[in-house]
Amino acid sequence: MPSVAIAGAGLVGALNACFFAQKGWDVSVYEFRKDIRTMKHVQGRSINLALSQRGKSALEAVGLKEYIVNQGVPLYARLVHNKDGKTYSRQPYGKPGEHIVSINRRHLNEVMITQAEKSPNVKFFFEHKVKSVDYDKKQLVVQCTSQPSRIPTFGTKSPPAEHEEFHVEADLIIACDGAYSAVRRSLMTIPRFDFSQEYIEHGYVELNIMANNNEFAFEENVFHLWPRGHFTLIALANRDKTFTVTIFAPFTEFEKHMSTTEEVLSFFEENFPDAYLLLGKEHIADTFNRVKPQSLVSIKCSPHSFFNNLVLMGDAAHAMVPFYGQGMNCGFEDCLVFSETLEEQNNDIASAVQVYSERRVNDAHTINDLAMYNYEELKDLVNKNSYKLRKKFDGFMNAIFPKSWIPLYSMVTFTRIPYSEVVDRRRKQDRILSNLWKTTSTLALIGAAIGIYSNRGRLGL
């Protein structure tokens, strides 16, 4: 059977392992961290994940959808908290019943690793750091950081010494090693490889609202949102009755208004009074004393494939800011699209790799841009009448033309329409709306002119 070497055992790497295990390939996964299933605390991002249709479709393809969805909390709407801490507005995500699912990142990752390992042809090598890719040999360069080494050996060959680099050969290499991908970095000198990176001015800090007498402290089946212009607070429910709370703000805001305990408590009490009471003074103060704001980066690159046997996926190909809830969903869809492409190309790896990149680059760039746009929506637009009016208009049109007029958010979240096509459809909707507005305005002006002409005598004209 063909072999695949996967760099990274995070969400996308673990799901890829499940896909190729299902195909019967020989799978080797190299991960620089220890096995997260054995760790008490896992470093890295823990912003709750919002599982939507693209991610569900990928999980369904490997038989995990039902289990994972049942492990999450369904969210049917945004609940926008006003600054007075007492009034709210509810904004349903889509049609009745349509929802996203709040999922714990670590649990999802552990489930997929365990699922992949059920296949005897799959092996995970933890504490094995992928350093680069060897252009000439088309192999991964890996460094063992564990003792003793768990690198597979054959015959009389001795295992490599501690920290010795070694090469991994496979028919296919998939780099899922994150936003700071070592594989992608080693490709940067290749001519015509385009790359862009942008850190946004905002950072984030995570907090928690604990269960109240083993019950949720407030409504669990909504995405809680406190939009305050240039900074925003969000909260998503967990199965254990807690909420993961995240504040997004410019680094300058953290420095000016959240540098001391007194400042941060005053800031939360003034801007998020209801959340402030549930979080508690001690937890807010302790969190900000221990944790520094984390940065958010947006990355694009093109192409996503090289050498007819190497593919970049997930954050290694398209790290995005988390404001559309599509980072994981897009990464999972990468796995599904590549699996579908392999089947279409009759398992011809070289053809599949090329076709995949051609299909995926534009979509990845598009959702990256949409994620940046959606932050403007989350932090400010949701409170504007123009936004609310457009949302109602889209809902009205969707009820009349359910197949041809689908709201932007619904296309992204509740379908598998390619991201680039989603934007094309939205632009068409915008043109129709613009023409409709012009026509309505013109008719109104004509009507006004007729009225004035008919009453010119009384008006003294």
Swiss-Prot record:
Class of this enzyme: oxidoreductase
Q: Does this entry carry the keyword Mitochondrion?
A: yes
Which SUPFAM superfamilies does this entry report, sorted A to Z?
FAD/NAD(P)-binding domain
Identify the keywords attached in UniProt to this record, alphabetized: FAD, Flavoprotein, Membrane, Mitochondrion, Monooxygenase, NADP, Oxidoreductase, Pyridine nucleotide biosynthesis, Transmembrane, Transmembrane helix
Localization per record = Mitochondrion; Membrane
Q: Which family does it belong to?
A: Belongs to the aromatic-ring hydroxylase family. KMO subfamily.
Cofactor(s) it depends on: FAD
Q: Which reaction does it catalyse?
A: L-kynurenine + NADPH + O2 + H(+) = 3-hydroxy-L-kynurenine + NADP(+) + H2O
Q: Would I find Flavoprotein among this entry's keywords? A: yes
Identify the EC number(s).
Answer: 1.14.13.9
- Which GO cellular component does the record give, naming just one? mitochondrial outer membrane
> So where does this one cross the membrane?
395-415, 432-452
Q: Which Pfam families match?
A: FAD_binding_3 (PF01494)
The name on file for this protein is Kynurenine 3-monooxygenase
Q: In which pathway does it act?
A: Cofactor biosynthesis; NAD(+) biosynthesis; quinolinate from L-kynurenine: step 1/3
Taxonomy, top ranks, is: Eukaryota, Metazoa, Ecdysozoa, Nematoda, Chromadorea
Species the sequence originates in = Caenorhabditis briggsae
Mind telling me which InterPro entries this protein's record contains?
FAD-bd, FAD/NAD-bd_sf, Kynurenine_monooxygenase
Gene Ontology terms, MF aspect = FAD binding; kynurenine 3-monooxygenase activity
**Family annotation (HAMAP family):** Kynurenine_monooxygenase
Q: Name one GO biological process term.
A: anthranilate metabolic process
Gene symbol of the encoding locus = kmo-1
Query: How would you describe this protein's topology in the membrane?
Result: Multi-pass membrane protein
